[in-house]
Amino acid sequence: DPLKLCLNVENLFVALKGGVSTNGFVSGDFLKALGKDGIVINISRGSVIDENSLLDALENNILSGAGLDVFENEPKINNRFFELNNVFMQPHQASATIKTRKEMGELQFQNILNYFETGSPLTLVPELN
C-alpha cells in the first residue's frame, strides 16, 4: 500500500509513468503521511503529483521540501513555487546523461529519415495519429 509506505519514510522519490492511471497519484494524503520532515522528489511526470496539494503542504510546513524536475503545466510553472525557499527546481533534465542524449538524437534522426522514406515517423505521437 503506497500510502502506508509514506507513513514509514521521510523521502519519497517519484518515478511513475504519466497517464490517466497515475494522474494525481501523489495526493495530499500522501504528503501528510510523509510528515514535516518529508521530502518529495519528482522526476517522472508533473501530472503524477497533485500540485495544489503539494504547494499547500510546502507553504504550510506540512512537508519539509520538494525537488522537482517536472511540473503539471510545463512550461507554465505555477508562480507559487517561485515564492518558496523549500523547493529545488530544475528544467526537466533528469534524463540528461550523455548516453540518453545521444539516443534521443539518434531517435530524432531515425524519425525524420523514416518519415521521408515511408511517410510516417517511427514513434508517432498518439494525438497526431
Language-model region placement:
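Rossmann-like adenosine-cofactor binding region
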Residues: 1-80
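C-terminal helix-to-coil terminal segments
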Residues: 74-129
